[in-house]
From Swiss-Prot:
The gene is B3galnt2. It comes from Mus musculus. GO terms for cellular component: endoplasmic reticulum; endoplasmic reticulum membrane; Golgi membrane. It is found in: Golgi apparatus membrane; Endoplasmic reticulum. This is UDP-GalNAc:beta-1,3-N-acetylgalactosaminyltransferase 2. N-glycosylated. The lineage of its organism: Eukaryota, Metazoa, Chordata, Craniata, Vertebrata.
């Protein structure tokens, strides 16, 4: 029996190791909550990784199958067949393990995964934006001569009137007050209402109102209402947290400082309410139809996500070049995707440099390696890219930044491509669960790097815009067809920007 055990043990051990190897190579299930790469390395602490000169991380959205395939058939294919670079570079696409379960039509904006939570909308009637408690003590005559409140429109509305509080101690209206509505970051008011003793408007409940020119404020509009006293006295105002917001069933949201709104220093005057406004909800029939069809739309979307998961699993199994990171794949989560990838590289690979790019970018890896040799780009704590300096912070739109208080970002490299040294990746990976993410991965990197002050190597050949320049290392924002054509021109002439050959 002992002899049989001696013979069987090596076979069992060999089979176990073979199965373990297959398991390591199999693509992760996006819904799997099993062991992470860190857990795997803890089980086998002496496991040896292949060493690479450069790890290339390509940020990619889940549905960008075509862009990934173009890369596999152009610069990645060229790399894999290169006589010297093929063993020196590891390329991985960075994809969120989960898709957003909210259909795009039902999100507050296309860049996040936040549900547009409209229920029982108030239609075909005017709505007072604020309701106030009965106790007069919650209103006070303050020393503040300028008070403001900001809001975001989640479904189109029309503001019909602007209003101000009246002082209960006065007989009639005895003040001179101007009320203005601004679009965020715009210096000129969209419309203005002026209140004075001879022209005080109409009293409704506890406010005096005046009609204003009516504009449809579209979805995603962000504005600020500002009350200004033209007298020496301050305004009668209330703390924002002591009023009830009538949001029309969820068509607008009042933004309070510290709750995702603009930092207080960017608001005009003191945050609060010194009056109100009246509005109506537009396109009510379309809204009701959308709400009625939402359950079916959600069910269809969940089915689509399941199909997408299966396609991604198959793609990963075939190509073995995807890292699924534990985030919901949306634009707002791109910085978190990047931090998760940095952690994966440290836990799962051995390398000297990391190159980050996007799936819509042209990359010339041969030129990158030649440049590294020419410029002697090695050693610790360095960051090589094309840096934007004193870049203004956007407060609205796709690049809206409500978390970073300065008017300009620290220096950051354009996202089309940059290279960082291993020790920087180690620092980012080690602090990945502590680092705050901002609206974009490029500006987030700039803010994170400001803490450690790496040596910056400026190089304009990492292009920031969609242009073609001889010797370029990267260029962004191409369609799959454009990327294929660029690479075909490069293979024909060596320079995609100066090639006169006709591409069939």
């Amino acid at each position: 029996m002992r002899n049989w055990l001696v013979l069987l043990c090596p076979c069992v051990l060999g089979a176990a190791l073979h199965l373990w190897h297959l398991w390591l190579r199999s693509p992760p299930d996006p819904h799997n909550t099993g062991p992470s790469a860190a857990d795997q390395s803890a089980l086998f602490p002496h496991w040896k990784f292949s060493h690479y000169d450069v790890v290339v991380g390509v940020l990619s959205a889940r549905n960008n199958h075509e862009l990934r395939n173009v890369i596999r058939n152009t610069w990645l294919k060229n790399l894999l067949h290169h006589p010297t670079l093929s063993q020196r570079v590891l390329v991985k696409f960075i994809i969120g393990a989960r898709g957003c379960e909210v259909p795009v039509e039902d999100r507050e904006d296309p860049y996040s995964c936040r549900l547009l939570n409209i229920t029982n909308p108030v239609l075909n009637q005017e709505i007072e934006a604020f309701s106030f408690p009965e106790d007069a003590s919650s209103s006070r005559l303050s020393e503040d001569r300028v008070v403001s409140v900001s809001f975001r429109v989640l479904y189109p509305i029309v503001i019909t009137s602007l209003g101000v509080f009246y002082d209960a101690s006065d007989v009639g209206f005895q003040r001179n007050i101007t009320v203005k509505l601004y679009q965020t970051e715009q210096e000129e008011a969209l419309f203005i209402a002026r209140f004075s003793p001879p022209s005080c408007g109409v009293q409704v409940n506890k406010l005096w109102y005046k009609p204003v020119e009516q504009f449809i404020l579209p979805e995603s509009f962000e504005g600020t209402i500002v009350w200004e006293s033209q007298d020496l006295h301050g305004l009668v105002s209330r703390n924002l947290h002591r009023v009830t917001v009538n949001d029309g069933g969820g068509v607008l949201r009042v933004l309070a400082a510290g709750e995702g709104a603009l930092p207080h220093e960017f608001m005009e005057g003191v945050e609060g309410v010194a009056g109100g406004f009246i509005y109506t909800v537009q396109e009510g029939d379309a809204l009701l139809r959308s709400l009625y069809s939402r359950p079916q739309r959600l069910a269809d979307h969940i089915q689509d996500l399941q199909v997408e998961d299966a396609l991604l699993q198959e793609e990963s199994s075939v190509h073995d070049d995807i890292v699924f990171v534990d985030v919901v794949d949306t634009y707002r989560n791109v910085p978190a995707k990047l931090l998760n990838f940095y952690r994966w590289t440290v836990e799962s690979t051995s390398f000297d440099l990391l190159l980050k790019t996007d799936d819509d970018c042209y990359i010339d890896l041969e030129a990158v390696f030649n440049r590294i040799a020419q410029k002697n780009l090695d050693g610790p704590n360095f960051w090589w890219g094309n840096f934007r300096l004193n870049w203004a912070v956007d407060r609205t739109g796709k690049w809206q930044e409500l978390e970073y208080p300065s008017p300009a970002y620290p220096a950051f490299a354009c996202g089309s491509g940059y290279v960082i040294s291993k020790d920087i990746v180690d620092w980012l990976a080690g602090n990945s669960r502590r680092l705050k993410t901002y609206q974009g991965e490029d500006v987030s990197m700039g803010i994170w790097m400001a803490a450690i002050g790496p040596k910056r190597h400026q190089d304009s050949l990492w292009l920031c815009e969609k242009t073609c320049e001889t010797g370029m290392l990267s260029s962004p924002q191409y369609s799959p067809e454009e990327l294929s054509k660029l690479w075909e021109l490069k293979e024909l002439c060596g320079d995609p920007c100066q090639c006169e050959a006709k591409v069939r």
